């Protein structure tokens, strides 16, 4: 895994949320198979790609999950903290957007598995002359490049 992941408690989650106020961050909600995931980030490129990659969700609908993509020199390089009860993730120092997208899809999958017995894979699908091919591989291996 190119980044370290750590589970945190609800109190630690609240502490992070208090420290990294949502004001001044770009925010957008995405509808991922009916799961609403909200991204908060200071990176305009990340928010633009988020809006390009996912269907927009209404701001009037409460998010099932939240991702805070934060740049902070005091935090370790590319570290993910996840609080499972509220499905809140803090992504520190992630410059590669593909990981942000992958984590959002993973959290949506986590919710869908628990509530609907729906299981997902990380891949790309290609249809050529009515013949389908699926590429399944980890992030940053070129699935999109090969299937675009």
Regions found by a protein language model. Give the residues of each.
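Glycine-rich phosphate-binding P-loop
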Residues: 128-148
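A noncatalytic interaction/capping subdomain that flanks phosphate/NTP-handling catalytic cores
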Residues: 1-132
């Amino acid at each position: 895994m190119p980044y370290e992941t750590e589970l945190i408690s609800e109190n630690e989650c609240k502490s992070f949320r208090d420290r990294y106020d949502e004001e001044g961050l770009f925010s957008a909600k995405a509808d991922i198979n009916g799961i609403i995931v909200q991204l908060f980030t200071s990176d305009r490129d990340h928010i633009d790609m988020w809006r390009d990659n996912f269907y927009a969700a209404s701001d009037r609908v409460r998010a099932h999950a939240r991702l805070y993509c934060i740049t902070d020199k005091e935090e370790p390089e590319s570290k993910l903290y996840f609080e499972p009860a509220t499905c809140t993730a803090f992504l520190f120092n992630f410059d590669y957007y593909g990981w942000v997208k992958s984590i959002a899809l993973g959290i949506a999958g986590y919710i869908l598995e628990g509530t609907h017995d729906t299981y997902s894979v990380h891949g790309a699908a290609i249809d050529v002359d009515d013949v389908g091919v699926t590429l399944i591989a980890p992030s940053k291996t070129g699935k999109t490049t090969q299937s675009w």
